[in-house]
């Protein structure tokens, strides 16, 4: 029995991905958000999430139609500044200003965070039109946020 266990462990060390499967079983990926929705012009989506320990966060976003958007992840305090269109700080590894698609991953400390999908003029991407037109330059986005 010990010989079989030793052989199994040896194979896991040699075979790529084997230990990843073990880690996934011990620490499974947790889905925080998964949606396909519209963001109207001059509006944003606020996604608040909390992690209890350092975790790897993955954000996948795909703009399916409409203008580019801003994707920001920040603390709650910085979200308050963002809402006022004041200068704010965001987590660069989990943010992508003026984007059409993002596939981000970073390990961050425990805490409460806010991810914003922004179709306003507070970020780098600017909805077209402005005061010239009454058209709603809404954006359709598909997004998923996970923690592991």
Regions found by a protein language model. Give the residues of each.
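Secretory targeting signatures
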Residues: 1-25
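C-terminal edge strands of extracellular/lumenal beta-sandwich accessory domains
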Residues: 21-29, 117-148
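Solvent-exposed, flexible loop/coil segments flanking beta-strands in beta-rich domains
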Residues: 21-58
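Surface-exposed beta-strand/loop patches in noncatalytic accessory domains
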Residues: 27-40, 64-100, 142-147
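Surface-exposed coil/turn segments at beta-strand junctions on protein surfaces, enriched
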Residues: 40, 50-54, 64, 97-99, ...
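Intrinsic-disorder/low-complexity, polar/charged segments enriched in Ser/Thr/Lys/Arg/Asp/Glu/Gln
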Residues: 42-48, 54-58, 101-103, 112, ...
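Hydrophobic beta-strand segments within beta-rich accessory/binding domains
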Residues: 48-71, 113-118
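Noncatalytic accessory or regulatory domains flanking protease catalytic cores in secreted, cell-surface
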Residues: 82-132
């Amino acid at each position: 029995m010990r010989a079989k266990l030793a052989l199994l462990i040896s194979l896991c060390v040699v075979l790529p991905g084997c230990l990843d499967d073990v880690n996934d079983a011990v620490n499974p990926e947790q889905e925080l958000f998964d949606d396909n929705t519209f963001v109207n012009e001059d509006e944003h989506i606020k996604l608040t999430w909390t992690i209890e320990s350092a975790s790897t966060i993955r954000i996948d976003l795909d703009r399916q139609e409409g203008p580019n958007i801003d994707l920001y992840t920040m603390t709650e305090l910085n979200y308050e500044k963002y809402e006022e269109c004041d200068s704010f700080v965001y987590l660069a590894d989990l943010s992508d200003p003026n984007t059409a698609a993002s596939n981000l991953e970073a390990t961050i400390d425990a805490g409460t965070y806010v991810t914003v999908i922004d179709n306003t003029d507070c970020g780098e991407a600017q909805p077209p039109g402005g005061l010239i037109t009454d058209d709603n330059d809404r954006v359709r986005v598909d997004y998923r946020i996970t923690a592991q």
